[in-house]
């Protein structure tokens, strides 16, 4: 009678296999062939070494018994896309037939049907609902296409080997069971009697396999590790591995395994971290070939084409090929976002950048916008090699796409690019050799049957391990039961997760570490630990579980003996306040930086680190060049000072400017939009009475498109229509009693109120028949909530009163009645704010106090941050990164400093609310 052995892989099942092999060899001779069928090639390698004393053992996997030509997975997805598109337009799946995920779902469901040996006819006979009938018809189309192209699996009939052992399987689909039945194993070793393995055990019992009583071994007591997130969890796992090696002489890295449920969550993070720490590693799944520099080169070239030569893509590709940092500055200055036409029209000067871009155009011309897969592959590889690509595995991976012409042709360049990404991501290169001295890293499925001295299991949180278990969206479990008992039930995945957890915890010979990230790195919200941990630890609830775990803080300061790298070594040493010489050895800036931070945060008084100039040389330069008595200043600059003195210091004294990315603009910048409105209105009024608004708009739009940054084309077209309508509305609402007489009137060095000498440009000056004048300042932005008629708004609304005074100087023979902010756009709410001459006379003392305060603070070098929480000027400030995230707390500590008393006093009510 065939023998069935039950038990855990280690130590029972593996020991039973060793005994069975020895018995077989003793009975049939040392050279008698013995076949052993296992789930993975890695397990075959492990058992080969374990059974090294025996000769003529032939390990095989199910992949060694092909059932016919295998269609490429990406080809099946293309076939699924085609079938999805051909579903009835009025059928059950009509609402989702164009969705991206339907093709993948169809192929997954059809694969389950095939593995259950279910023919299209059998499916159609059990299809009792419109949904099932539609799905059965699609399955018939799928199988028909595969049959016509010789891809449909055919039952293989291999000759049974003289002797075969089946080792390590706990689940087999119908097709696999049929194969095993034909191979007629004489002994089967099943690693579990858990519920998930019961269907296999029942099937083996029907074949007269007699099970042995499983031997139970006590599980290795686990250590628990709770880390704040995946990056910290990975580092702690590595730290645990190195600590184990330190404490266990004679152990090697390959005696340790770091395992996880799915590759998506940890694979890249572990690769990057272990590479950074220079730790030898064997990644069971290998490394994606997409990480090779030549693969990156190929994908960057495709991204350049996909984005129509966007500035970002072109510069990234250029940077990959060499150092061209000056190209970044040049393209910003030219306002290049992308597009072949924009490169050609704006990049006039000969030079290496223009040569490079023209070369890209020539290479890109070798790839059509659409075509057969083979043509696209040929064109891409030719361009790639021209750019320096050489790595043969990259070329071979791309060449496999040529076979997809059978499934769908032609395809667009966008589809081709997508599939290039996929084939390079899924093609893997070996990373280290198994048990060759490197740390073993794998997903749990790939490590089945292996054992290690230390096993560290990562990601034990809900939705990771156990993975989310969901029914097939196309074929529910209830429908699967109706169709065939051979179809797998998706909700049985819960049992598989329990089984996998049992297997992985049993794979630790000496020490088991169970780890989970307790915080979501994106939201910092707590995560729920896996319910699998409760059974493994005996904890009654998650609160008790956390008490059992080693709790890694968010920012740990560690003992130096546990440091993984210099930074972790230096931090605890710095906590001990070492000498300046030690700090200097770490970094020449460290001592000064720590001293500045301590001085800034330990004092309630303002310091030189808060915007107070105290150095005599700095003050001398300030008095020489930047005090108001030496400047001809704009009203906007003065408003900036009262917005925040530190902002004024950065913008107008240090001249610090943000380095904007042209492509970051979704639409035209607010400053450019304002200038465009100004130019259009100036042209219109200057050409009166024969002005053609339509022609003026067209000319200005064309001029800006040639030189400025318009953002996305569709949004720009919408913005142009808005400009047309808002300009037309403004002109229709014009008061005929006021006639424009001056446009964009420049003035400079006008002493309007000592010590302020003003410069600026008045958008428009209107006159009435009685020789009264008014000043208009166009506003195209959003209306500021704190603006009020005849109000300085704490110094943040000085333009109207100062322009009113300037107009009086410019037109001494006329009466300047008022100055107005004219918000004439939808964003501005069509509001008008005015400042009258009468109000200005009444507030003359207040204006002088404001200007005097600014002059005195600048003279004293007081440029402290003004950062109240309410109505904060920090929200959209370009210099927020300089101030840091703690600026509001710092302001609360220091706003009572005497240096800011007068400033807060003239700011008025708003400052009082936040002081």
Q: Model-found features: residue ranges?
A:
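Anion-coordinating catalytic cores for phosphoryl-, nucleotidyl-, and glycosidic chemistry
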Residues: 2-61, 205-828, 834-904, 908-909, ...
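Short, charged, surface-exposed secondary-structure boundary motifs
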Residues: 66-72, 197-201, 290-297, 468
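Conserved helicase NTPase motor core
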Residues: 120-206, 226-229, 233, 453-454, ...
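Basic/charged alpha-beta structural segments of nucleotide/phosphate-handling enzymes
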Residues: 38-159, 174, 325-351
């Amino acid at each position: 009678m065939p023998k069935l052995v039950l038990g855990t892989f280690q130590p029972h099942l593996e020991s039973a296999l060793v005994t069975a092999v020895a018995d077989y060899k003793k009975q049939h001779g040392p050279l008698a062939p013995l076949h052993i069928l296992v789930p993975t090639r890695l397990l075959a390698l492990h058992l080969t070494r374990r059974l090294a004393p025996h000769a003529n053992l032939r390990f095989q996997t199910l992949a060694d018994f092909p059932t016919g030509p295998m269609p490429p997975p990406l080809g099946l997805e293309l076939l699924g896309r085609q079938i999805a598109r051909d579903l009835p337009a009025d059928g059950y799946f009509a609402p989702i037939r164009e969705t991206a995920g339907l093709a993948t779902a169809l192929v997954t469901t059809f694969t389950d049907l095939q593995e259950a040996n279910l023919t299209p006819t059998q499916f159609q006979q059990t299809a009792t609902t419109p949904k099932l009938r539609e799905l059965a018809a699609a399955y018939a189309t799928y199988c028909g296409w595969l049959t016509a192209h010789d891809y449909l699996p055919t039952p293989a009939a291999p000759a049974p080997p003289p002797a075969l052992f089946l080792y390590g399987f706990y689940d087999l689909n119908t097709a696999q069971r049929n194969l095993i039945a034909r191979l007629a194993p004489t002994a089967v070793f099943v690693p579990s009697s858990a519920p998930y393995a019961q269907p296999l055990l029942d099937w083996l019992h029907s074949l007269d396999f007699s099970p042995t009583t499983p031997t139970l071994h006590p599980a290795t007591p686990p250590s628990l590790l709770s880390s704040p997130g995946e990056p910290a969890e990975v580092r702690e796992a590595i730290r645990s591995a190195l600590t184990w090696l330190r404490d266990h002489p004679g152990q090697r890295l390959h005696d340790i395994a770091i395992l996880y449920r799915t590759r998506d969550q940890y694979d890249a993070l572990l690769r990057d971290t272990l590479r950074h720490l220079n730790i030898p590693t064997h990644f069971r799944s290998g490394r994606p070939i997409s990480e090779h520099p030549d693969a990156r080169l190929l994908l960057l070239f495709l991204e350049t084409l996909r984005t129509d030569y966007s500035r970002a893509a072109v510069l990234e590709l250029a940077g990959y090929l060499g150092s061209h940092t000056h190209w970044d500055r040049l393209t910003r200055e030219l306002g290049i976002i992308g597009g072949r036409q924009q490169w050609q029209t704006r990049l006039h000067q000969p030079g290496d950048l223009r040569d490079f871009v023209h070369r890209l155009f020539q290479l890109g011309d070798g790839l059509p916008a659409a075509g057969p897969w083979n043509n696209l592959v040929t064109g891409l590889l030719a361009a790639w090699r021209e750019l320096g690509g050489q790595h043969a595995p990259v070329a071979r991976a791309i060449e496999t796409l040529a076979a997809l012409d059978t499934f769908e042709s032609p395809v667009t360049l966008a589809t081709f690019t997508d599939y290039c990404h996929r084939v390079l991501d899924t093609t893997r290169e070996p990373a280290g050799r198994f048990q060759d001295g490197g740390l073993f890293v794998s997903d749990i499925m790939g490590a089945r049957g292996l054992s290690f001295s230390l096993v560290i299991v990562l990601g034990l949180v809900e939705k990771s391990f156990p993975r989310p278990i969901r029914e097939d969206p196309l074929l529910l479990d209830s429908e699967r039961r109706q169709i065939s008992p051979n179809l797998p039930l998706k909700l049985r995945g819960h049992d598989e997760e329990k089984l996998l957890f049992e297997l992985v915890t049993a794979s630790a010979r000496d020490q088991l570490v169970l780890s989970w990230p307790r915080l979501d790195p994106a939201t910092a919200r707590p995560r729920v630990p896996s319910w699998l941990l409760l059974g493994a630890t005996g904890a009654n609830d998650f609160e008790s579980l956390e008490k059992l775990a080693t709790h890694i803080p968010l920012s740990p300061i560690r003992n130096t003996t546990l440091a993984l790298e210099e930074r972790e070594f230096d931090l605890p040493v710095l906590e001990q306040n070492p000498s300046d010489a030690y700090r200097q050895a770490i970094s020449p800036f460290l001592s000064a930086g720590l001293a500045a931070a301590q001085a800034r945060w330990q004092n309630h008084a303002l310091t030189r680190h808060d915007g107070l100039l105290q150095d005599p040389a700095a003050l001398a330069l300030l008095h020489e060049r930047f005090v108001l008595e030496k400047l001809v200043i704009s009203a906007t600059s003065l408003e900036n000072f009262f917005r925040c003195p530190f902002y004024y210091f950065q913008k107008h004294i240090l001249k610090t400017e943000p380095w904007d990315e042209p492509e970051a603009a979704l639409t035209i910048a607010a400053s450019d939009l304002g200038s465009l409105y100004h130019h259009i209105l100036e042209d219109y009024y200057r050409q009166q009475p024969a002005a053609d608004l339509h022609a003026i708009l067209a000319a200005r739009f064309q001029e800006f498109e040639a030189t400025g940054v318009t953002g996305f084309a569709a949004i720009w077209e919408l913005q142009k229509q808005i400009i047309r309508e808002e300009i037309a509305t403004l002109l229709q609402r014009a008061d005929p009693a006021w006639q424009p007489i001056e446009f964009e009137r420049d003035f400079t060095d006008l002493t309007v109120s000592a010590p302020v000498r003003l410069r600026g440009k008045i958008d428009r000056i209107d006159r009435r028949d009685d020789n009264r004048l008014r000043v208009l300042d166009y506003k195209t932005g959003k209306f500021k909530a704190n603006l009020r008629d005849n109000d300085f708004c704490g110094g943040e609304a000085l333009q109207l009163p100062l322009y009113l005074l300037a107009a009086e100087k410019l037109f001494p023979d006329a009466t300047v009645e008022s100055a107005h902010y004219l918000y004439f756009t939808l964003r501005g709410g069509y509001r008008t704010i005015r400042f009258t001459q009468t109000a200005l006379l009444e507030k003359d003392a207040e204006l002088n106090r404001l200007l005097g305060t600014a002059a005195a603070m600048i003279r004293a070098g007081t440029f402290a941050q003004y950062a109240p929480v309410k109505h904060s000027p920090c929200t959209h400030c370009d210099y927020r990164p300089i101030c840091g995230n703690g600026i509001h707390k710092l302001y609360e500590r220091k706003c009572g400093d005497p240096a800011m008393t007068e400033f807060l006093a003239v700011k008025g009510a708003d400052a009082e609310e936040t002081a």
